[in-house]
């Protein structure tokens, strides 16, 4: 007799029908009055599995199968969230790049356009912002490109702020970049060396503000006026194109953007702007191609990826699926060259969870790139569009367009037809570079983006512009804080040892301190290397001398005054005082990773004997404190005391046990050693379980008996382990530490064990 079907929750959170039969081609069979709820739970589990299947197929490079799975999930009721299609977009971009033989476009070398040029747009470095990885960008690029990674080192840029309520994605990265102020030193140098360029950059910034406020007429007038004075400024042409697009004068916007592409054919932002114009004009397929071209050149261009996600989400929506996914919608996708995609097996029939497991798809993405014979932004159109030549604009670049289709009045026609874009369109070479179909014109040499901004008159080079405000010396390993101030790395670290605030503006640097990256500001260092080589050489010489002085292991050895330490015994430390933070950091930076440990002394500040500690690991806490894992090394005697930057130092000599050569004395020492070792084991085993577990947790297990008693300068390791765990006065322990005779040390330990063994027997 079968029991009624009962819904149960799977470990993954999906609901499955248990106990009831399910038809292969029909809905879930459920009993009782909760049929609607049970069916909703089953459908939810099904589309979640389809989404996971689509992600796995996309990660495996199976584009068509991934498209089918995502479309099926949306039809089953999955929420239409574009951000869930990230893996599908990555697969699509990879396929596009492979098909067109493209490679990711890294930033140009600094020398290509001068040092004071933006790594992203290659333009003048206006309002330079230094990101955490140490590279500098103009604020315009960080705001408008909304980069997720550094263009040069591929390091992640600061994350955007938390998403506001009702927003599926975090706000643009520009919100986070706003927390990073303009670099004070770099901005001062840019204004001092290139005042004209700086003023033009300010004017461009005002254009950006007008566009942001939607004042397109004013922005257009200002851009045209600026271009009359600087006709070769490509940034101004981009601003003018955006003004045209805001006024729905799409043809004029495309002409400006193509003029920019003619000069810089591998600039991802321009492809994105051009795609946005076509998207606003209604040419979805052409826009998609341009967004993919943008991502093929720069896979971290976040706005383009978001637009592709939205387009794919629309194409895969149930409405489009029910219409059969028209060929015009899918022909723009790379590697989908055959008839339009249908989804008979995945979409029309229900499947069990077992049937939705990942299988090898029948069709695979083509691996070999094929030469591109047509325009990359030209999609197959359902209707032929006759193009009419348009007189050239002031930039001399001819355009071929259907003018009525690009006007605001023809917007309704645009939504139904494909645009036969431009006679001069972009092609892709096998080497990954773009070229123009029309070869009669070549990019001009006086482009604003190729001016060598690095040619600085000698009289403008002033070493005081490169001085650290803390040490008043030339920057050495300069770092820039989020508030925009620059310091020597060591100087800033020492300040943050005392308080997590900027030494100049007192802005909180708690997050900067917790990150602990301190990446060198590359541009500032390159400027010093190029223009102040002699001063830098002298500064480096001073630094090397200071480092060598800190590297001595017998003179001016740093002393940590805290507790007893013993050879081979672990000694964990919690370091919170600024002076000891500095001491630990210097020990690591010099490479010695060693310092002395002594107990305090009322007369001489610290004892005459101590033990060197070797740093094994350091765990830094967000507020600058650290937990240092050390182990004891050599014993030493203090010869001379000193002080450096707040912590104690000492000249020392190392202690070694006096070796015994006489055979009878060696046998006697062996007998004493074995006797004390057995006595120590007995005492430890007779301890209460609580005490024994605490000792094992803190010091580890007792070392094994050693065959060669004089193999090391400090004797058997178990002696020091036992001395560390025995509850005796530190002065008594210090006297044992200072002994250079193993026999005397064993005798002392034997006396202590005898005393404690009597207490255990009571």
From Swiss-Prot:
The answer to whether keyword Manganese applies is: no
RING-type ZnF: 118-154, 468-506
Give the keywords, sorted: Metal-binding, Phosphoprotein, Repeat, TPR repeat, Zinc, Zinc-finger
Q: What is this protein called?
A: LON peptidase N-terminal domain and RING finger protein 1
GO CC annotations, alphabetized = cytoplasm
Q: Which organism is it from?
A: Mus musculus (Mouse)
Task: Return one GO MF term.
Answer: zinc ion binding
**Can you say where the TPR repeats lie in this chain?**
47-80, 201-233, 235-267, 268-301
């Amino acid at each position: 007799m079968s029991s009624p079907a009962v819904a149960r929750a799977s470990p993954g959170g999906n609901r499955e029908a248990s106990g009831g039969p399910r038809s292969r081609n029909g809905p879930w069979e459920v009993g009782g009055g909760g049929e609607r709820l049970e069916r909703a739970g089953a459908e939810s589990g099904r589309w979640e599995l389809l989404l996971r299947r689509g992600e796995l197929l996309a990660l495996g490079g199976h584009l068509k199968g991934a498209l089918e799975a995502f479309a099926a999930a949306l039809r089953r009721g999955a929420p239409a969230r574009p951000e869930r299609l990230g893996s599908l977009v990555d697969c699509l971009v990879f396929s596009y790049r492979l098909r067109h033989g493209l490679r990711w476009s890294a930033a140009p070398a600094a020398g290509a356009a001068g040092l004071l040029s933006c790594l992203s747009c290659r333009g003048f470095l206006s309002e330079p912002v230094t990101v955490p990885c140490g590279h500098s960008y103009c604020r315009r690029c960080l705001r408008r490109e909304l980069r997720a990674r550094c263009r040069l080192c591929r390091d992640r840029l600061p994350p955007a702020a938390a998403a506001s309520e009702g927003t599926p994605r975090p706000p643009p990265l520009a919100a986070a970049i706003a927390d990073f102020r303009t670099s004070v030193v770099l901005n001062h140098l840019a204004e001092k060396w290139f005042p004209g360029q700086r003023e033009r950059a300010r004017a461009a910034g005002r254009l950006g503000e007008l566009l942001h406020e939607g004042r397109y007429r004013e922005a257009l007038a200002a851009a045209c006026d600026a271009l009359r004075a600087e006709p070769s400024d490509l940034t101004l042409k981009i601003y003018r194109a955006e003004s045209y697009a805001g006024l729905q004068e799409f043809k004029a916007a495309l002409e400006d953007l193509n003029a920019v592409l003619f000069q810089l054919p591998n600039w991802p932002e321009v492809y994105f702007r051009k795609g946005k114009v076509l998207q606003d004009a209604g040419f979805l397929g052409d826009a998609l191609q341009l967004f993919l071209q943008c991502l093929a050149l720069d896979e971290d261009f976040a706005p383009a990826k978001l637009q592709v996600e939205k387009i794919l989400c629309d194409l895969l929506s149930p409405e489009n699926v029910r219409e059969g996914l028209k060929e015009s919608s899918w022909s723009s996708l790379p590697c989908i060259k055959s008839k339009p995609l249908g989804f008979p097996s995945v979409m029309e029939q229900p499947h069990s969870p077992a049937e939705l497991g990942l299988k090898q798809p029948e069709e695979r993405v083509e691996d070999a790139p094929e030469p591109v014979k047509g325009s990359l932004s030209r999609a197959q159109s359902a209707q032929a569009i006759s193009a009419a030549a348009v007189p050239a604009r002031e930039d001399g670049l001819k355009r071929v367009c259907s003018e009525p289709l690009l006007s605001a009045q023809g917007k309704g026609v645009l939504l139904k037809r494909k645009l036969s874009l431009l006679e001069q369109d972009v092609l892709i070479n096998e080497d990954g570079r773009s070229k123009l179909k029309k070869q009669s014109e070549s990019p001009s040499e006086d482009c604003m983006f190729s001016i060598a901004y690095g040619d600085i008159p000698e009289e403008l080079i002033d070493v005081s512009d490169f001085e650290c405000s803390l040490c008043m010396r030339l920057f050495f390993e300069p770092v820039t804080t989020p508030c925009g101030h620059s310091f020597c790395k060591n100087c800033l670290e020492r300040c943050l040892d005392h308080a997590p605030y900027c030494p100049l503006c007192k802005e909180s640097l708690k997050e900067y301190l917790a990150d602990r990256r301190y990446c060198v500001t590359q541009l500032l260092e390159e400027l010093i290397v190029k223009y102040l080589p002699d001063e830098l050489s002298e500064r480096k010489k001073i630094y090397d001398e200071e480092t060598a002085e800190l590297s001595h292991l017998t003179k001016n050895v740093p002393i940590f005054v805290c507790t007893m330490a013993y050879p081979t015994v672990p000694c964990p430390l919690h370091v919170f005082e600024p002076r000891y933070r500095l001491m630990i950091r210097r020990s690591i930076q010099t490479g010695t990773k060693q310092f002395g440990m002594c107990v305090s002394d009322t007369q001489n500040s610290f004892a005459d004997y101590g033990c060197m500690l070797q740093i094994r690991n350091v765990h830094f806490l967000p507020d600058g404190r650290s937990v240092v894992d050390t182990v004891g090394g050599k014993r030493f005697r203090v010869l001379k005391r000193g002080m450096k930057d707040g912590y104690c130092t000492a000249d020392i000599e190392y202690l070694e046990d006096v070796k015994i050569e006489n055979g009878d004395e060696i046998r006697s020492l062996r007998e004493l050693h074995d006797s004390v070792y057995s006595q120590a084991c007995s005492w430890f085993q007779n301890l209460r379980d609580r005490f024994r577990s605490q000792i094992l947790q803190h010091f580890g297990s007792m070392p094994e008996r050693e065959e060669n008693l004089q193999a090391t300068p400090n004797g058997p390791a178990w002696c020091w382990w036992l001395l560390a765990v025995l509850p005796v006065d530190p002065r008594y322990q210090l006297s044992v530490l200072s002994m250079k005779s193993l026999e005397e040390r064993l005798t002392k330990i034997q006396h202590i064990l005898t005393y404690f063994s009597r207490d255990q027997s009571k």
